[in-house]
Amino acid sequence: LSSRFVVVNRQVLWRSPILLTPYRSDYTIDADELKEFFGNAFKEAELTPEDIDTGAVILTGEALKRNNARAIADLFAEESGKFVCASAGHNLEALMAANGSGAVALSRQEHQTILNIDIGGGTIKLGLCHGGKLLSTSAFAVGGRLIAFDEDGKMIRIEGPAEQVAEDVGVKLTLGEVLSKEDRKKIVSRMVDVIVSYATREPNDELCKALLLTENLPQTPAIDGITFSGGVSEYIYRREEEDRGDLGRSIAHDLRHALADKRIPEKVYDPGHGIRATVVGASQFTVQVSGNTIFLSEKEKLPIRNVPVASLSIDLSVDFTSEEVTASIQDAMKRLDMVEGEDRVAIAFRWGGDPLHARLFALAQGICNGLPKTVADPDLPMVVMMDGDAGRTLGNILVKELDVTGEVISVDNVQLRDFDFVDIGEYMPDTQVVPLIIKSLLFTSPGQE
């Protein structure tokens, strides 16, 4: 039996129009325009904020770099009281796009290796999927809005990576001037060359290397199919034709020609979610209750809200070492773009095998070594969650044998995964449990609504 609720039906009630992120000249996001957009959306959907049970605010790409980005996101999250707020770095955004686009589900359905190419305004995120799992991610600085134009065709925004590409093809970019058709074609063609190089896993020239934001994708396994997501994908799949005053439509046009010429030879699938890929997994509440063998070193500090979950991939049902636990934590943090010691995190794992002291001690030691800054920071709670019945024993080992002096929360009989955020409620002494609210980002499969 499981205490986790299962989603049996999902229905899209209303879709908003797409709003390009409103940037101001002082390197901030226009909060007033966002508020007006959200207000109009509620009116058109015939809903009020009180009607919404849960949601998510996700910061990605160029918007994440703006001076007031986090403050705006936190404001909307806190005003609703029910929203989670996540900052998506390159790896996490690639992971979310691969899931949200339907590429991960497609790889499971087709029993194939699928490469999702998420083309946004400032970056491209790659997600390599196989058998329903994301194997690897990568990102590089090419995007549809690295150059933006006004109604007269004059350049009103030029990002650094665009200047790198322009310099590579001998074009000078100047704000307020018109970019000639010939120079525009040179820049777009070179950007598509870079996309093709990364899609075929051959990014060997100097410009490709200069634009790389993460590690490269591995050379194996062989790719069977390609999917596209992000704003530019709407042009690739011909769902959008209107020019948005940037390079997006031109990039898609040249990329379609590259696909037709088999420069990217794999079959192209359309899983359907395109520009909404990173937000299609709208957050949902589930409720769980912990086991009664939990460990809380400082009960009075509860409740805590919106702790992101990092799920470990290590198999703890067989023999393992503390070093393997540490490596699994580091991999999870990297996968989700979390910075250990700066971000609160709940380490979640499946527990199997005998609850012998030696095994639990190795687990605890691996956790401490994987979270050294958390251990050293008395203001940062160590949150550990498992599906087995060893929460109290693990907590005792962490505090009494490994001398963790900060707050330790060790909760058992709970099932968590990546894209979950957890609220841990106040301790209930009569039943010796804590209530948990799990907010999950849920992703549809291709063909679902």
Listing of model-derived features with the role each one plays in the protein:
Residues 332-333:
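A short, well-ordered alpha-helical element
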Residues 261-262, 374:
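Secondary-structure transition/capping motifs at alpha-helix termini
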Residues 247-260:
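Hydrophobic alpha/beta core scaffold segments
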Residues 118-120:
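Conserved catalytic-loop position in the HRD/HxD motif
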Residues 4-11, 15-116, 129-250, 273, ...:
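Nucleotide/phosphate-binding catalytic cleft detector across ATP-hydrolyzing
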Residues 1, 124-129:
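Short beta-strand scaffold segments in enzyme catalytic cores
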Residues 263-268, 312-314:
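Short beta-alpha connecting loops at secondary-structure transitions
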